[in-house]
Every structure is written in C-alpha cells, then in structure tokens.
Amino acid sequence: MPRLAAIVGGDGECEAVPILVRRIALALDPGLTLDIKPVLRVPESRLIKQGELERVVDLAARKTGGQGGILILLDCDDGCPAEDGPELLRRAISARRDLPISVVLAKREFEAWFLAAAESLRGRRGLADDLAAPPDPETVRGAKE
C-alpha cells in the first residue's frame, strides 16, 4: 500500500488534503488504496526559514517509514508559485533525496481552487444549483469565508 505524508500550511488543508488525495487516487486507479499519514501543519512563515522545511521534510519521511512520498501543499499568498515552488522543491529534495517529493503552491489561497470549481460543485452540500465561479478566483482573498 503506497504511503504518503503531507505537509501543509493551514488548518483547511489539514482536513482537505487526505480527502482530495484519496479522491484523485480513486479517479486514477479505483483499486488503489493509500496509507495517508497524519498531516503535518506548519505555517508557511516558518517553512520558508532556512532549515525548517528540511527538518519537517525529514519528519514526514520518518512518518512514512522511509517508504512513500511527500506532498508539500502551501498557500503562496503574494508570492509567485512559478518562482517559489522550484526553490522549495530543491530544499525539500536536499533534505531527503531518497523519497519522491512534490511541492504544490496555490496562488494566493488553496481555498480558491474550490471557487474555480464552483460549477462542478453546484447543488452539492447545500450549494446553489446555479453556483458560478468568480471571473478570476485566484485574486479572491478570504476564499474560505
């Protein structure tokens, strides 16, 4: 059974990441079962400090027993995912070259992804049947409110 450890920056991601990863895995391979370890929540402001991301990546690797992958999912806020992502990935890989690691940075906020997917969520969990995405979901601040 494949193992995955996730590192996230916010409370919303702690709850959502295991569910989203399982749903994506199910869509790709209905027979796949993942062993998703408890999510590590570390604020982005701490993870950007030299040595902290590396420490948390090593902790995540130990949670997988050294056999699995690591997903790092963070809000990029006012940064640029295309610029910040490769540097964070480089640092993460330098901490644990023996495991596959992915860094995913949400432009502004992770929750904006749900705004972008509004049409696919219509009529679910009490959402309006005519729900529409805002013109530019990634510019919305406070998307979870």
Regions found by a protein language model. Name each.
Residues 1-4, 12-145:
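C-terminal accessory helical subdomains adjacent to catalytic cores in phosphodiester-
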Residues 9:
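Phosphate-binding/switch region of NTP-binding enzymes
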